[in-house]
Amino acid sequence: MDEREGQSMSRKRDGARNFFPMPQKIFNLGMNAGEIAVYTYLMFRENRKTYQCYPSYRTIGDAVGMSRNTVKKYVDALVEKQLIYVEPTKVKTRDGGMRNGNLLYTIRPLEAALEYHLEQQMKTYSQQTLARQGTSPV
């Protein structure tokens, strides 16, 4: 390898602009591969100051190789797991009317999702314990 090739390779690997942080704790939340893919894409697109982004289902699907309906299913799961908050937006049309815009996604603090996940695990454990004992939950 000559000097020019070595410089070219180091430039390709250089720069934090080609990377974004992903918290390791997402692997402790019982997420499946589809949920991780959608969550990762939202983290990639988020504004690092507001923790928000607004890609369409189609844009997310194109990026992660899923249909619009599959993306919606995983977004709903991420909301349920308290990893993201979703709110509708409105856009003004050229003729002055209003129409629905893309959803606005807010990436929530991971601690809330971890707490929710642990609560769900405790509920499941309690229900299983009661079922083994032959009693029903109150």
Question: Predicted segment positions?
Answer:
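Charged low-complexity intrinsically disordered patches
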Residues: M1-R11, E80, T106-V138
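Generic alpha-helical propensity signal that fires on short helical segments
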Residues: K49-Y51, S56, I84, N102, ...
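Short, cationic-aromatic polyanion-contact patches
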Residues: S56, T89-Y116
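A general lysine-centric signal
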Residues: K72-K73, K81
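Short, low-complexity, polar/charged sequence segments that are solvent-exposed and flexible
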Residues: Y57-G61, Y74, L104-T106, T124-Q127
